[in-house]
């Protein structure tokens, strides 16, 4: 409130201090802005320093593992699913001089299950013993597979695994050991309904080539399905399963193998002989319950000096591949 002299009298007037408030607000905002900018700059600098320090630690780890190697010592023979390996998977960690490295942390990746035909894996953190070795024997499994276990230098949790140089360095030091677990078709056996077709697409015979290859791979209890009429080709699998189940039941044989072997490309004359392509479509069915346990397809191209030689070579290569899929996939 101010008193202003006007026409010889003091008049009381109320004065609003907008300008003062505005100037105060501007000063306050300016101060706040300066503080924020200072803090932001400080935070960015801090992040940059931390980032540099983090990569420095990763580079140090990369340098450390550059001087080591993980080598395979022993891989046990394949087993049938449901059984344990008779010996351990064994490896050793060595330094640049070839000496064993004790208490070295290693990550082990190994198969633990199969879902819809796809292998799933788990990991373990292990340390080398005093002699630099690692021994591992997985529990018996309920699935078959032909895959690998992997051993890599264990990355400390404090490091950033998204750093590309780190993952590349670890990958370069990874050891893969083959792990093979056979299907129980080896001891349970199977009946075969796999018809070979000629170049005109007509079924000719239940595949003796495949039957022989299964026997050669240890499947002693194997024979043609008691119900093998070609009229079942292309029909629902349940009809073929039911017809054979009525004859042999669900325990005499472990599996019913159903499928076809057809010419994808007929025998063709080429400069140095003949060539053809065959394709096999195979389904494995559990005789106990009729469930499909394997679906696989293999295509093969081969050559030969004449028609018979070409087809024979192609059938041989094809059945070798398809039987391997059955042994390690059923």
Task: Locate predicted features.
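C-terminal motif of bacterial Sec signal peptides marking the signal peptidase cleavage site
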Residues: 30-33
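Surface-exposed short loop/turn segments
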Residues: 35-36, 238-289
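Beta-strand-rich structural segments
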Residues: 77-106, 136-138
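Short amphipathic beta-strand segments in non-cytosolic proteins
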Residues: 85, 107-125
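Glycine-centered loop-to-beta-strand initiation motif
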Residues: 128-138
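Short beta-strand elements
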Residues: 160-193
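N-terminal segment of the mature soluble domain
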Residues: 186-258
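Short secondary-structure boundary motifs at beta->alpha junctions and helix caps
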Residues: 285-329
